[in-house]
Amino acid sequence: MSFYESVFIVRQDVSLNDIDKIVDDFTKIIKDNNGAIVKKEYWGLRALAYKIGNHKKGHYYLLGLDTTPAVKQELERKMKLNENIIRFLTQKVDSISNEPSPILKNQSTENTPVIDVTAN
């Protein structure tokens, strides 16, 4: 199995509960195929670097994955089909850090709730 980090952006009008459902669906896909989610981080509602369609903001979410390339491809296929996800990027990494990402470290914890940061 390989390690991947996947960041996806959800439309700004989607609620946090709906984002949780999206993440739960992705978690189910990975766990059903003997993979694991090593890290989850919600980075909050942030301005996009440029307008994507009619969207100027989006909810950013990071997933650290320990899975096979085939499962990663299935996860990306699901992201493409989900109309609430406006962009995503998945990269292969050597390892996944136990510490919060630099973006999460720089955020004010008062303004943005952290949904989950886990490490195995």
Swiss-Prot record:
InterPro entries: Ribosomal_bS6, Ribosomal_bS6_sf, Ribosomal_S6_plastid/chlpt, Transl_elong_EF1B/ribsomal_bS6. This is Small ribosomal subunit protein bS6. GO terms for biological process: translation. The keyword Membrane does not apply. Keywords: Ribonucleoprotein, Ribosomal protein, RNA-binding, rRNA-binding. The gene is rpsF. Residues 97-112 have a biased composition (Polar residues). One of its GO terms (cellular component) is ribosome. One of its GO terms (molecular function) is structural constituent of ribosome. Signal peptide: none annotated. Binds together with bS18 to 16S ribosomal RNA. Residues 97-120 are annotated as: Disordered. It comes from Rickettsia bellii (strain OSU 85-389). Belongs to the bacterial ribosomal protein bS6 family.
